[in-house]
């Protein structure tokens, strides 16, 4: 999973 993307959700 892309945690950098999830953190901005």
From Swiss-Prot:
GO cellular component: extracellular region
UniProt entry tagged with the keyword Secreted: yes
Protein name: Extended FMRFamide-2
Predominant localisation class: secreted
Family designation: Belongs to the FARP (FMRF amide related peptide) family.
Subcellular location(s) per record: Secreted
Top-rank lineage group of the source organism: Eukaryota
Phylogenetic classification of the source organism: Eukaryota, Metazoa, Ecdysozoa, Arthropoda, Hexapoda
Keyword Lipid biosynthesis: no
GO biological process terms, semicolon-separated: neuropeptide signaling pathway
Coiled coil location: none
Record key words, sorted: Neuropeptide, Secreted
Record's function text: FMRFamides and FMRFamide-like peptides are neuropeptides.
């Amino acid at each position: 999973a892309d945690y950098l993307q999830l953190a901005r959700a």
